[in-house]
Amino acid sequence: MAESRQTRLQVKCPTCQTAVVWKPENAFRPFCSQRCKLIDLGGWADGKYTVSGQTESLPEISEPDGAYR
């Protein structure tokens, strides 16, 4: 009953734009389903999405003596 008194926050699934209630029980939030979550993950893996900013080069690490070969 307490939930009915509160305003339920709804967001749109970033993948399919379906309305999703934002609540702890929704394991896929902000997505509506596991499928939409995996589609988004695939987009990141394919380079479809990026985070803007400067690229930093990583320091070179030399192999220690007796390295795995």
UniProtKB/Swiss-Prot annotation:
Organism: Neisseria gonorrhoeae (strain ATCC 700825 / FA 1090)
UniProt cofactor note: Binds 1 zinc ion.
Reported function: Inhibits all the catalytic activities of DNA gyrase by preventing its interaction with DNA. Acts by binding directly to the C-terminal domain of GyrB, which probably disrupts DNA binding by the gyrase.
UniProt keyword annotation of tRNA-binding present: no
TM regions (residue ranges): none
Residues that coordinate or bind Zn(2+): 13, 16, 32, 36
Needed co-factor(s): Zn(2+)
Keywords, sorted A to Z: Metal-binding, Zinc
Name of the protein this chain belongs to: DNA gyrase inhibitor YacG
Family: Belongs to the DNA gyrase inhibitor YacG family.
Subunit structure: Interacts with GyrB.
KW Lipid biosynthesis (keyword) present: no
One Pfam family of this chain: YacG
Source lineage: Bacteria, Pseudomonadati, Pseudomonadota, Betaproteobacteria, Neisseriales
Cited InterPro entries: DNA_gyrase_inhibitor_YacG, Znf_NHR/GATA
GO molecular function: DNA topoisomerase type II (double strand cut, ATP-hydrolyzing) inhibitor activity; zinc ion binding
Source organism, top-level taxon: Bacteria
